[in-house]
Amino acid sequence: MNPSYKPSDVESAAQAQWSAADAYRVTEDASRKKYYACSMLPYPSGKLHMGHVRNYTINDMLTRYLRMSGYNVLMPMGWDAFGLPAENAALKNGVPPAKWTYENIDYMRGQLQAMGLAIDWSREIATCDPSYYKWNQWLFLKMLEKGIAYRKTQVVNWDPVDQTVLANEQVIDGKGWRTGATVERREIPGYYLKISDYAEELLEHTQHKLPGWPERVKLMQENWIGKSEGVRFAFTHDIQDASGRLIQDGRMYVFTTRADTIMGVTFCAVAPEHPLAAHAATLDPKVAAFIEECKSGGTTEAELATQEKKGVPTGLTVKHPITEEQVPVWVGNYVLINYGDGAVMGVPAHDERDFAFANKYGIEIIQVVLVDDEPHFDYHRWQDWYGDKQRGVTINSDNFSGMTHKEAVAAVAHALAQKGLGEMQTTWRLRDWGVSRQRYWGTPIPIIHCDEHGAVPVPEKDLPVVLPTDCVPDGSGNPLAKHEGFHAGVVCPVCGKPARRETDTMDTFVDSSWYFMRYCDPKNEQAMVAEGADYWMPMDQYIGGIEHAILHLLYARFWTKVMRDLGLVKVDEPFSKLLTQGMVLNHIYYHRDEKGGKNYHPPLEVTPTLDAQGRIVGGTTADGTKIEYGGVGKMGKSERNGVDPQDLIEKYGADTARLYTMFTAPPEATLEWNDAAVEGSYRFLRRVWNFGVAQADVAPVAFGGQAFGKAAQALRREVHTVLRQVDYDYQRMQYNTVVSGAMKLLNALEGFKPDGSAGDAAALREGLGILLRCLYPATPHITHQLWQHLGYDKELGDLLDAPWPVVDVAALEQDEIELMLQVNGKLRGALRVPAGASKAEIEALALSCDDFVKFAEGAPAKRVIVVPGRLVNVVI
């Protein structure tokens, strides 16, 4: 046993043993309790970052603890391998995305193995492998059969640089999330999945079937699903198109949750793509120009909420459904064609957006709701009470005046229904999922286009439709459209005539919507999932970042419900518990160039400048460059403030990297990087090693039957007290306090002073064995080696499956306890009494102790109050 702690030697030896024993391969076992713990699969970008290290160490600690506790535990790993970054890297380096991706996978797999993670690599998947994405295609065809998947033309966000459709969430301030290019609105055909059909169930299950999820995430999902109760009704009109037909049968429909304000409508606004807007554009060049301008904006609610609200009058009017007065129609850049009917009623007096719009363009404002005790209505300054539907009562509303919000909504809905113009309706913010992407590196959509029969599904026997792996993107659109081999020999399944394949590929969120089920049965060539999923699902613990709170998690839940309805799985929800780990942060430093741009510097290259309070205010580099301080932010490439896990492992070892990320903050909290604390974690492990080395020459003593002296009893009391807390912390996944508990154990062991009793050696050996097991899930290499070197494996087996230590309740009992001593309610000292002392015995000891005699100064005691286990108060 090397007297010095050499992490590389320790870790390579442990990993070699685990590899030789195939230690982490797991099989289904109905006789054992199962536990499925999984981290969100990584994108193979080339290197792990510290966020990965933290995420997977959390998973690994849970896995190892539960395995020692008797569970059959699955911790798998795979690669979210499709996506645009691979195409961009290929474009930059002139290599096929497949080559770039698989090289990255090989490198990152090695990094994960160097971390010592308890991953069952026999279940590894890569979403770019045809054996995986075949089942994406298969389920897509099943969805087509069931009407869940369908094709339509719709206005989408188009990134003109990447030449692809962006999801709403990928549009930030009107620009593409990756390229920064101004997003355009385009109408293109594509495939959609009817997630909206599952909206009610998704909402209900969010509220009632996810007790192990953070409330924050559930609220985000509820808001995204967005259930609204309101009234859908029509403004009628007699506007005809060029052929003399009534546009939309003479009805312009809107939906509102504020039907109580219908008498305050002074205008309506339609989306730039609405049929009335298109008609107006043929009559007025200003309208046509405005519609063209709107095409450069995004189609997201988030963007519309922040951009300037603009519009133009169309010159058209529609008839108010109650008053029958003519209402002017505007085209508004804030109205989305994909939401509702692409038209909204304008009630400036009681909607803040409409209020600003009306004041900007001089549109009439009519107050129709009054809130008692509020100031006079100001037509030029918005006040929050204008939109208060809970306290408001209708005014200036003819037959609907004097009603509360609920009363007025019901009355208006009834009146509109009698006219045949409207009805109560539930609407959803959730929109069907557009899965078509104009990209190469993704799952091919299994459709064949025939001149005679149109879009025809690929027969199941011909799956998978294999993606060519020899494409090197050149930046000009989708390479699949130009790849002759992809279309060679393709014929229509209906008529047998030459045809072409669909060149759109699937959104990569499809790949990540069910991979966790494929882990359960990854080699099955005959079925998407089988018995393995029946055993392992639902997943017991899912771990990933809060950034996936909406899309990935919602899509995975939807996908699970579709698979359930197709009889593939038996669960309603895929993830029983969810942990969203905090981000890893680091300092940000930069200097500005001549144009004011920021040039970032790695923190290790900067000597910080501190103010009088010790706060960082700037810094300098080795060449004297003055550096500005940008605060603390998420580690990332753009700010150059990341820490390479490989560098950390090479310098300190994987156990130190793991220990530091677990000790510094609770799993769900952000972790602020501190190089000095990393060094501290390493020093602690060196102490553990040195203590183990010191015990290596001591002959193992079998535990049991020894008489323990006071020193040994005190040690065992401390050890089992800490063990009880550590076990509790493991159960609630508070790993930072698990590590601090291990540090307390080491302090107790190092501070143990034997008093010569027969049980001294046994107590010390027991304590060290408990320390190694408590620390093992966090730092498996060093503890594994010490466990073997010290002979614990001969008694309890390999540390992998050693039984989790049980708290000895008897060891927690104390001969004496310490009580606070008070005189007239003021703390005057401490009183040690036998643990089982009676009230009378405690009173006698209190009255005779030195502290009481000193402060009483001869005064007799009038009363003695004893609070068991806490204090004794003598009243004089």
Swiss-Prot record:
Its main subcellular localisation, reduced to a broad class, is cytoplasm
Q: Give the intrachain disulfide bonds.
A: none
Alphabetically, the GO molecular function entries are:
aminoacyl-tRNA deacylase activity; ATP binding; leucine-tRNA ligase activity
Motif 'HIGH' region: which ranges? 42-52
Q: Where are the transmembrane segments?
A: none
Supply the InterPro entries for this chain. aa-tRNA-synth_I_CS, Leu-tRNA-ligase, Leu_tRNA-synth_edit, M/V/L/I-tRNA-synth_anticd-bd, Methionyl/Leucyl_tRNA_Synth, Rossmann-like_a/b/a_fold, tRNAsynth_Ia_anticodon-bd, Val/Leu/Ile-tRNA-synth_edit
Family membership noted in the UniProt record? Belongs to the class-I aminoacyl-tRNA synthetase family.
The record's annotation in NCBIfam families points to:
leuS_bact
Q: What is this protein called?
A: Leucine--tRNA ligase
Q: Which gene encodes it?
A: leuS
